[in-house]
Amino acid sequence: MERGEGRRGDCSVQVRKKRTRRKSDGPDSIAETIKWWKEQNQKLQEENSSRKAPAKGSKKGCMAGKGGPENSNCAYRGVRQRTWGKWVAEIREPNRGRRLWLGSFPTALEAAHAYDEAARAMYGPTARVNFADNSTDANSGCTSAPSLMMSNGPATIPSDEKDELESPPFIVANGPAVLYQPDKKDVLERVVPEVQDVKTEGSNGLKRVCQERKTMEVCESEGIVLHKEVNISYDYFNVHEVVEMIIVELSADQKTEVHEEYQEGDDGFSLFSY
């Protein structure tokens, strides 16, 4: 009984140590650790001695099937993606030290820059970095990063597309845009032939002639050619109404009596009065 109680007491005394992660600020923070390694490298440079270059390591990152969906397409050193999409960066301290957590970042590019900053502080000029000093981006990095999809250089055009672009006579330049002004001789007195559609409609013996005219007018104003289409429709007079008016006038002339009076003038001429 006593042995059992003693064993139970020993188990209760043993407490599992909790692994603590370094904070971003404080005496044992990431910034303080990087600062300390930077000071150590400066001392080595003053003593004309250099630190051993870090091992090349592997760029495989997480194991196959592990990490985020874009982790397999990223080749940045010290960068990997979590399953929920965040990018993290970590670096191993010199002299086979432990891995230093650098933090989580929204993009792989930011995580790669954080790794380079820590690598230069820890290893000095012999550090293996993702980007050189004179470049901000790398073409061999993460293909999924949107910032790497755009290049500052001129875009290459396939040969088939070049032929299509070179065929038109117009050339687009980077200079100020110039408005093309055609020659006045080619523009003036140019009128599109008129199209006339004549429609005849009959109803109760009445005929109505409707004429539709479509005219294209070409106007020139300050070197800019304006094409204007005018639709004109004319409704002419009613033929039947005109005929009725003529018949009425003729019948009225027949009913009126014509009075003719012969008068002799002094000058010998014959005068008729109506």
Curated annotation (Swiss-Prot):
Domain of life: Eukaryota
An annotated Gene Ontology molecular function: DNA-binding transcription factor activity
Gene3D superfamilies: AP2/ERF domain (3.30.730.10)
GO biological process: positive regulation of DNA-templated transcription; response to stress
SMART domains the record matches: AP2
DNA-binding region(s), chain positions: 75-132
Region (Disordered): 1-75
Assigned GO CC terms: nucleus
Family in the record: Belongs to the AP2/ERF transcription factor family. ERF subfamily.
Name under which the protein is recorded: Dehydration-responsive element-binding protein 2A
